[in-house]
Amino acid sequence: SILLSIIGMLTGAVVDTIGIRKTLLISIFFLLFSRFFMSFVTNPALIFVLGFIPMAIGFAVVGPLVSIAIKKYTTKETAAMGFGLFYVLMNLGYAIGSMLFDKIRGFFSVTDAAGVVNENAGTMLFGLHFTTYQMVFVIGFGFTIISLIVAFFIRDHIEINDEGELVKTPKKELGSGLESVKNSAIDVATMLKNVVVEKTFWIYIGILALTLFVRCVFFHFSYTFPKYGISVLGEGAPIGNIYGFLNSVLIIFAVPIVSYITKKTSSYKMMIIGSVVSSLACFIAVIPPSFFEGLTNTPLGELVFIKWLNLVDSPEKMSGITAVSEYWPLIFFIFIFTIGESIWSPRLMQFTAEIAPKGKEGTYIALSILPWFAAKFFVGPMSGLLIKIYTPFENGHPLPASPDHAMIWFWIGAMALLTPVTLFCFGKFFMRKLSVESEK
């Protein structure tokens, strides 16, 4: 995670130097390389070197790269919809990935005579045994090949001006072979050096730092929520569907509507409104499950447990679902959080691109990871501490959860609330400073 941030901070300057298409192809190459070896290799040291490191490089490049491309290929009028559409497509990918993850786990799992589920049983392929999680990477490798083919058709060195006209941008002459690599490295270093001494850049970083508190909830969804879900709902619970699918599908429908309705509202104001909604949503998970018990044996309960999560095949069996009432606070929490996310998250991406000076978009957008990089040194240990206190594990299996396990989301929600509070309190100060610097 930290490696992702370090590489991502360098990506923008690379894009500004060699262009979008070449940078994207480099990224996809690293992802192909990592997914190939993670499909076959089982040695932890080799997985780290041949899998995790190239995967971190590939992923780190993609995020800033897409934001830079949207900035170059949209006008001021279409930027909100452009970033909104990207956010929709990204979450469509998450939704498909979440469904595939749970489907693959279920398809390749084995249940013994005692009813114990082994999720990682796997299968034989090409005369070799692949575990369930190796099969995830085999399938991912196939999808990445499709991405590589599509990337070859991208046009480079063009952008759209504010009048909506297609403009060709000059291609930088970097020489050939080793000289090209050397000149690219020099240009990247020069770009980074020039940007980090600008006052505008540090004001920009200050604003982004205030958004960290609510953005850290995403980190907890990735690292804290899976263990929380397994501990509270039981092993084999469809935790990928509960967050990954529900969140992504809602985003797909909500973001275009919100983007269109609010396209003339400032990004900063939308960030405040959306972060309030998302922050307060965390506290829904703290509500006692007994409050929602009446919803289980209703048409909504049938929709959730039979049609969506596929936990049982008939209404009569719903009361037998392990920790059935515990699902409801989490579902409503994620639902409301996602509504807030659809308001603030795409606009944060747009705000990041709006502030970046022309010609330095890539460097600014990539270096916007800097506060997020610093936050990981705090939020990672926070996640580990919360899990240890409220939902402990031993040898990869959950121990009995604390009766106060929902307090995990109280502390996460309290942290998230700092974002709208600080954005509101310091907004005028930062905007005034940005205005002064832009006039110089």
Task: Give short role names for the model-derived ranges.
Residues 6-42:
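Conserved MFS/SLC helix-loop-helix module at the cytosolic interface between two early adjacent transmembrane helices
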Residues 1-2, 225-250, 273, 324-332, ...:
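Loop-to-transmembrane helix entry
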Residues 3-8, 239-264, 274-287:
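Transmembrane alpha-helices of Major Facilitator/SLC transporters
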Residues 29-43, 276-323:
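C-terminal ends and interior cores of transmembrane alpha-helices
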